[in-house]
Each structure stands twice: as C-alpha cells, then as structure tokens.
C-alpha cells in the first residue's frame, strides 16, 4: 500500500518538482490498485486504530474488516478523480484562486494546470474498472445484510406502533357502553335540591336557639310564600312571641327545655295561631324514648328522599347538641361510567344528604353521608357521634346514664282538607275557634287535640300516637313559665352552646 502521508510531506517543500512526480504517479496508479485485490486484502495486516492514517476518512459501512484497507485506497482514488475533474473546470481562474485551492488540499500533490492530465487519469480509471471485472470496489460494497436489518427494524417499529392502538381500543370499549344522551328526568330523581327550602333557612340564629330557628325554617317552607305556602313568612321573633317568650331573646337559654316533643308542640301552637293544619312525627329514632320500632335505615332513607322531592313535608335533624334542616340529597353512582345513567339500583349508589345550617359559625349547607347519619342515630350513651365533625369519630360524653339516644329525624307535614278523606267529620269540629289574647304566657288549647275523637286520632298519623297523648298530659300540667327554670325531659345539653 503506497504511503500517502509520506508523499504528502515530501511534496510540501518541493513545490517546483510537481510536474516530474505527477507522471510516475499516473503510471503506477493502475499497478497499485491491482496489487490490492480482495484476495490479497483478506491477508493484509491491519494495525491498531491508532496506527492507521486514512487521509480522507472513508465512510466504510460494511462490518467485515477485510475491506477496510481496500476501501481506504479506493476512496482516495475516487476523491482524487473528483478533485482533478473540478480543477479542469476552474483552470481559467486567477492565480490567487489556484493558490487557495492548493492550500485546502495541501496533502494531495496532483498536477491541476493541465487539462489533458485529468483526461488521462479518467481513462486510466476506466481501464482499471474494466480490468477488475466483477471484483467489488470500495463503492460497490455488498449491503444486503444491512437491508435485512432495516426490514427487521421496520417490522419491530410497526409492532410497537400497533400495540398502543390495541391498548387504546381496549380502553375505549367500556366508554361505548355509556349512554350518548342525557336522561334529564332520571338524573333529577337522583339530585334533589329545592332552593325554596334553602331560602327558608332562618340564619343566623340566636345563641342556643337552633331548635326554634329550625322550626321556623320548616314552617316557612310549608306555609309561607317564601316556600310552598301562601302566608307571609314569619321570623324567629314572631314565633317566640306566639309561644309566649319575651325579649331579650339573647338571654334565653333554650337548651335545657328544647327537646323533640317540644318542637312538635310548638309546631302545633304556631299552626293554631295561623289557623292552618299540619302534623308532626318522628321519622327515624332507633334508640331511646319514643323510638320508631320496626323502622329500618333503608325505609327511613326511602321516606326521607321521597319527602324531599315533595313540597308538603319538611324535616329537622337532631344531632349532637344541635338542630338543623335536611333540604336535599344526591344519590352518587358508585362507578364513574354511570354518572349520567338513568335508573340505578339502590346498591349502585351512595346517598349524601344536604342539610341547611342555621348557625353562622358553620357552612350554610352541609353534605353528609347517609351512613354517617345512621351511625349517629344508632349510637347510645355514653358514646356519641358528632355529625358536624365526623373526623373525630366515636366520642364519649361524661354521663352516668347508659343507653338511649335523643338524636332522631323529625318530620313536619302540611295537611289539606282532602287528607281527611270521606270520613264523616263535621267541619265545625275541625274549624278552629277564635283564640283569646295570650296572657301570662299561658298555652292555648288546641281544638285539634281536644275535639277530635280517639278513633280519628288514629287515622291522622303518628302525631296522634301514644307519645302524643303523653304530650297532652305534659301540656296540661306545665306552662312555659315553670319550664323555664327546669329542664324538659327530652332536652339535650345546651343547644349550640358554643355559638
């Protein structure tokens, strides 16, 4: 193999001797290429990479080392031919251009001034290719192995591209089951919130007046124009005046004498004052006095949700140290794919109850799980569950009493004349008589309690039950003035004592 670097180094100081050396180079060119055939290249000694000096850095792509030397030599010849061709086209340029060209390729000593030399070199290369015949040259390297590798890579990349498509198709299959059109009526049955109930919430309350504030909220929804009635709405102050209380109302401690039956009695007194009809009863109370025997949590939930869809029933929830009013609910599906489904089974949804808050120190609307409410109603002394702070879990109160629970759901219902049905009732007995002015905070008699027979009491609902009869006896024995100094038998601890 000719030493190209040696020729290049010797050619630099001897610029004047280019013409005599160019002719031997052309004569030996054909012999040099012949000497490096493929058979001889297989036995060629290839040194380490540090000892190789290839002037043109031939881009050899074949993996077999036996072609490295041949590729380097033939690449040099190929580059030399291209330089000779380019030099013949610019022979008419200025001498400065010739010097610049010679500086850029200073490691090749070729005669570029004569055009016939380039033609002779082209002819010698043509004769070289003809003499080699079918022997592969540097630019004729077999790349069949590379084509097979590229096809494999393409096939693998195609497989990789197809796999995510299959995954997306699998993920998209469940989405096809979702309904395309929203069934509005069915969704309305699962999400119920009558804004009139919220409008009627008496907020804020007086200190420890959550019981009477919740009762006023229910009454306004049932009978006032603010809700579903036709009477003007009443305020807490008007209701307290009807019940015999006098200002300042901030100084009244309602907690000791405000209980479940107390609220039911006050509801009837306000109805008698405004000459309207209604009834009240305990919807769900699993433990303690006046418990709803035989009522289950599922049945109570069904009645509660059905009543919240109507405008003839209002509710009060007695929880830990507080009263407030359920105003709506949402039945949330357990699966995201059923968010807009129509009718769902009860086991496929989870119920949340929206509760209006009369206290200004808490959010205006609570959203509590029905399961948490059931937990609260089913705990017994000394255990209790604060529904407004469910994160605290079960707690224990300091009391000697064991068993029982005052927490419950109370229902207040507006009655119409059609509710009495075809029973042979005299309208005179049902029409309230004029009431004398309230003096000395005396509780007026209710004609609905005294003039209706016991048989008719059994037909009018739960407000005329054994608990109702006990309430009558209690009303005859006590008045409001006497009860202000002593606690009610069903009174809880100070209602909203922290407000």
From Swiss-Prot:
Annotated segments matching region Disordered: 1-29, 153-172, 428-465
Top-level taxon of origin: Eukaryota
Subcellular location: Cytoplasm; Nucleus
Polar residues bias spans: 153-162
Composition-biased stretches (Basic and acidic residues): 444-453
A GO CC term attached to the entry: nucleus
Keywords: Cytoplasm, Nucleus
Family: Belongs to the BIVM family.
UniProt-recorded name of the protein: Basic immunoglobulin-like variable motif-containing protein
Organism: Xenopus tropicalis
Organismal lineage: Eukaryota, Metazoa, Chordata, Craniata, Vertebrata
Gene expressing this chain: bivm
